[in-house]
Amino acid sequence: MMENNRNFFITIALSVAILTLWQVFYMNPRIEAERETTRIAAEHAQPAQPGQSAQPPAAGSADLPGGATPAMPAEGVPGSGVPGSGVPGAGVPGVLSRQDAIASSGRVRIETPRLAGSINLTGARIDDLVLRDYRATVEPNSPNIELLSPSSLPDGYYAEIGFIGTAAAGALPGPDTVWTAAGDTALTPSTPVTLTFTNESGLTFTRTIAVDNDYLFTISDAIANESGEAVSLSSYGRVARIGTPHVAGFYILHEGLIGVTGEEGLQEIDYSDLAEKREIKPGKSNDGWLGITDKYWAVALVPSGAEAFQPRYAYFDDGRVRYQADFLADPVELAAGETRNVETLVFAGAKETAKIDAYEESRGIRNFDLLIDWGWFYFITKPMFYVIDWLFRLLGNFGLAILATTVLVKAVFFPLANKSYKSMANMKKVQPQLMEIREKYGDDRMKQQQAMMELYKTEKINPLAGCWPVLIQIPVFFALYKVLYVTIEMRHAPFFGWIRDLSAPDPTSVFNLFGLLPYDVPTFLMIGIWPLIMGVTMFLQMRMNPTPPDPTQAMIFNWMPVVFTFMLAAFPAGLVIYWAWNNTLSIIQQGVIMKRQGAKIELWDNLVGLFRKKPKPAE
């Protein structure tokens, strides 16, 4: 039994050591890089003004789906110039400011309770979008998040819907098409806008763009064929991004191109993988969606599904790096005098769970909830989010909701934990008998193990029962970590005091006396108040049990709280608060059960023993 315990503790020690090294040399540098990116974004962003776009999206040039131009199909993928190439400086990153890029073309304003921006009449692109409800940092005067930008900027990012057809169809709506808006109207939830375009062949396109109160645009195209002959055309849509954005690069979070289409289902493609493969084409599909996702924001297209479509994820590097998620619908025949309607949905905004789920249900969008990276433990993570969110609405604070969730989890697992703690209490009762067995059999480990197992069987004790309280926490711990890390609802959610963002690490550090000393400390020394509280509660919980007699086990026993304090210091504050509160509840629960079982609580004796002089070994 002693040998098993030794191996168990050594395994834990090695695991903790690996996690610590991973945290120091892998996670901490990435967290530091993410903080630096946020700081730079905050410095360069401009606050959004009501009714005015704070950041115009880029109308960038990107190759069209299916390797075709708007006028006709083509075998190769032509490199098209930046739409509106008559604008001085267009296509030359850094020449135009954001304001100049927006002002260089005609636009229709977007004014909703949650969005500000504009639609570029060249290409009818949604390329200027600002999120009114979200800011770059926790500071109330920090800039709003600028989601989309014109393509003439280094960080161009936009969504575009157009058509491709045969030469007989003439010039079809594409990147360079200049649409005509009906009057000087703004796009609001109550006032859709109508754009028109008529080509030389007699095809008239009437586009109606509507937006809801949140993040969903509905683009409805009515195509009237007045050319006198039948034509064939296909609708396409694309989300294009210029430049490679900074990503966290953390394995529990996907940032890059994403979609759910065809038999393949969910496709998650990293920027680096797409740059290597250049193009990824899943099978054709009649439903689904595709786009580009960040940690908290996303832009996605939902084809109508009336015709099958070919999804594609592509990378271009012809002077400027571009990533593109696009689709090309099967061609349809439009008889002379016929009018056909095509509808495409565009999601552009924050990945709010309730909104994403509502769109999936009301619009019938297949697996749209996978736009949020719930991970492999989806069946635990998403329900846990909804529990926390429900408690938040009840209590008004996500920190309190996490504490209440911990109590609920404790209640759910109480029967198992209760049985475990009872077994641990019984183990304490038989300690004298175990000592007798060790003395009786000395170095004969085989007989010692047999005698111990017989004693456990007689007393109905499970020697590994003490592991259950820790093991049952592991899936809950990782599910909560996922919720805190990937859900936007936790972003900038405050607790009390100095914790202004539960999704970020505790900003204080003991090494500068929690901010009293005027200098910053390295990331790996950011040991804040809550990590210290967590470490103390873990230390007290471990001291509830006798110190292992084996020196190796005793050393691990003593150092484990210290190691975990350093390791969890860089984790989200909400997770550390959960762990500290969970330890506190476990101490109370274990103490009550042990007292009822008549087992001695070793906490006080172990604490006193830390300050007691150890006897010198006999000469």
Where are these regions (language model features)?
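Membrane-protein biogenesis/insertion across secretory and organellar systems
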Residues: M1-A411, L603-E619
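Membrane-interface amphipathic helices and adjacent TM-edge segments
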Residues: L203, D221, G337, V412-F477, ...
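Core hydrophobic alpha-helical membrane-spanning segments
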Residues: F9-Q23, F477-L480, L532-V536, V562-V563
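Transmembrane alpha-helical segments that form the functional core of multipass membrane systems
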Residues: D369-K440, M446-K447, M453-K457, F477, ...
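Hydrophobic core segments of alpha-helical transmembrane domains in multi-pass membrane proteins
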Residues: P531, G574-N583
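Conserved catalytic motifs of ABC-family nucleotide-binding domains
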Residues: A479-G535
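Transmembrane helix interruption/hinge and helix-loop junction motifs
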Residues: L395-F398, F566-V576
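Hydrophobic alpha-helical transmembrane segments
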Residues: A404-V409, Q473, M526-F539
